[in-house]
């Protein structure tokens, strides 16, 4: 008898009652719920901001690969198109990476073999970029590009002040 009394009310009341009924049964899902359901580990944050007369839906992802972020942006935009009644008529969609901690601990260097890194040496201001080629007990070997020629250079771990991952 849930729907028996609805016919006596306006369309708006019908919509509200139907919405509450479906929500209780778990049939209606908000855009946030849908996005978090589809991308539980990917979405870091969903926020609305307003600047002057413009509304921005900002979605921050746990992803650093630009190509993947572009793919996810298209997918998320398509999902949001199905929720246009729930969203403002005009808004800007801003999807970005939350970034990463680029600092690498010496104990974790094994995870960065054959990856592009940058090191800072103790008592030197110049940073050296290269591919982490080999890891030994007390040293690392970087494959460094010197004017178009690659050279493998060995650095003592205790002479390295900071190691950072380089995103190309």
Swiss-Prot record:
Q: Name one GO cellular component term.
A: cytoplasm
InterPro entries hit by this protein: Ribosome_maturation_RimP, RimP_C_sf, RimP_N, RimP_N_sf
Q: Which domain of life is it from?
A: Bacteria
* Primary location class: cytoplasm
Q: Give the location in the cell.
A: Cytoplasm
Please name the SUPFAM superfamilies in this protein's record. Answer: YhbC-like, C-terminal domain (SSF74942), YhbC-like, N-terminal domain (SSF75420)
The signal peptide stretch is: none
Q: Which family does it belong to?
A: Belongs to the RimP family.
User: Tell me, what does this protein do in biology?
Assistant: Required for maturation of 30S ribosomal subunits.
Q: What is this protein called?
A: Ribosome maturation factor RimP
